Amino acid sequence: MEKAIRNFLSQESAGGILLMAAVILAMIMANSPLSGLYQGFLHTEMQVRVGSLDIDKTLIHWINDGLMALFFMLIGLEVKRELLEGALSSREQASLPTFAAIGGMIFPAAIYLIFNYADPITQVGWAIPAATDIAFALGIMALLGSRVPVALKVFLLALAIIDDLGVVVIIAMFYSTDLSAISLVVAALAIVILVGLNRKGVTALAPYGVVGLILWIAVLKSGVHATLAGVIIAFCIPLRAKDGSSPSEHLEHSLHPWSTFVILPIFAFANAGVDLSGMSLGDLLSPVPVGIALGLLLGKPLGVLLFSFVAVKLKLAALPEGMGWRHIAPVAVMCGIGFTMSMFISSLAFIGDGEAYGDLARLGILTGSIMSAVIGYFWLSKVLPEKGEKS
């Protein structure tokens, strides 16, 4: 189990560094003579037509609706494994990261709404600073190498997984519009078939893939965000077969490098390019970017620390063995690294009348995430022992 966790963390850490490179490249492209090429490429129309089925979207929408469905499938597989056998499988293990994640979602949303309470168009972005980018956070932590105890990495991992689950619920409840009854019925039938496959003990992944594709198309057409199909498929794939093998873990291990080194960097490159040329100081200090940046930089650590402190004082949770508040505090700051997850919610929140706020939102995400990464890194570096020393 420990080896699996170490492998997971090493992949996520390397992926976080690659994500940083993708964000930097996107910013360079968006603010150079290549800007037109960058935007034109992302808005290239791509159509798939099979009989009466017609899916016509720009490349950036294929990335956000299609590739990210695979990423959310991986999240679903991770959540299922951790709930049944991993770091969230017992109340003692799950309590602290659960309370921390809840606080870390409430406080950033509240701070954002304080700055945007008067504008109903920008209010819809309240969930943007509530997310944590697990790959980026672990990537920053990886820069400190073996000085970081595995227990601290597992705490951040568990917190981020619960945070991701919260994001899934938020997307389902608040960012689904113009629902199609027929598509929802087809999606429901697909879910029934997936559950039936699970109950019948079907461990071959191909049937889940075929029905899962139907589910993804139905959800895409229904008005509910298509990425949720990935989570549903993941929850239906068996964790254990009768012979002791794990179809779920096999798929998770197969998806992980693709998600870490292909899907998320492509998503970051497609969504992080903010054109700064037309922005004024007033734009930079407007409610949307300020609310997001402060939500990530202040709201995240305040929520994580306050809810964790109260839970420990009420004996509802306990600190990880060998860890103190001086270790938890900089990790709480690192939870303010929103990046890809925050950008994903931003792409759902600011559409239609609010589309003009998209660049401002991404600017706030980049500002808050970078500041959280820098402060969290140096703070954690200061409290951790040097190599060869004991904490």
Swiss-Prot record:
<keyword id="KW-0406">Ion transport</keyword>
<keyword id="KW-0050">Antiport</keyword>
<keyword id="KW-1133">Transmembrane helix</keyword>
<keyword id="KW-0812">Transmembrane</keyword>
<feature type="transmembrane region" description="Helical">
    <location>
        <begin position="14"/>
        <end position="34"/>
    </location>
</feature>
<feature type="transmembrane region" description="Helical">
    <location>
        <begin position="154"/>
        <end position="174"/>
    </location>
</feature>
<feature type="transmembrane region" description="Helical">
    <location>
        <begin position="59"/>
        <end position="79"/>
    </location>
</feature>
<feature type="transmembrane region" description="Helical">
    <location>
        <begin position="261"/>
        <end position="281"/>
    </location>
</feature>
<dbReference type="GO" id="GO:0005886">
    <property type="term" value="C:plasma membrane"/>
</dbReference>
<feature type="transmembrane region" description="Helical">
    <location>
        <begin position="95"/>
        <end position="115"/>
    </location>
</feature>
<comment type="similarity">
    <text>Belongs to the NhaA Na(+)/H(+) (TC 2.A.33) antiporter family.</text>
</comment>
<protein>
    <recommendedName>
        <fullName>Na(+)/H(+) antiporter NhaA</fullName>
    </recommendedName>
</protein>
<feature type="transmembrane region" description="Helical">
    <location>
        <begin position="331"/>
        <end position="351"/>
    </location>
</feature>
<dbReference type="GO" id="GO:0015385">
    <property type="term" value="F:sodium:proton antiporter activity"/>
</dbReference>
<keyword id="KW-0915">Sodium</keyword>
<dbReference type="Pfam" id="PF06965">
    <property type="entry name" value="Na_H_antiport_1"/>
</dbReference>
<keyword id="KW-0739">Sodium transport</keyword>
<feature type="transmembrane region" description="Helical">
    <location>
        <begin position="213"/>
        <end position="233"/>
    </location>
</feature>
<dbReference type="GO" id="GO:0006885">
    <property type="term" value="P:regulation of pH"/>
</dbReference>
<feature type="transmembrane region" description="Helical">
    <location>
        <begin position="124"/>
        <end position="144"/>
    </location>
</feature>
<keyword id="KW-0997">Cell inner membrane</keyword>
<keyword id="KW-1003">Cell membrane</keyword>
<comment type="function">
    <text>Na(+)/H(+) antiporter that extrudes sodium in exchange for external protons.</text>
</comment>
<dbReference type="InterPro" id="IPR023171">
    <property type="entry name" value="Na/H_antiporter_dom_sf"/>
</dbReference>
<feature type="transmembrane region" description="Helical">
    <location>
        <begin position="177"/>
        <end position="197"/>
    </location>
</feature>
<feature type="transmembrane region" description="Helical">
    <location>
        <begin position="292"/>
        <end position="312"/>
    </location>
</feature>
<keyword id="KW-0472">Membrane</keyword>
<feature type="transmembrane region" description="Helical">
    <location>
        <begin position="363"/>
        <end position="383"/>
    </location>
</feature>
<keyword id="KW-0813">Transport</keyword>
<dbReference type="InterPro" id="IPR004670">
    <property type="entry name" value="NhaA"/>
</dbReference>
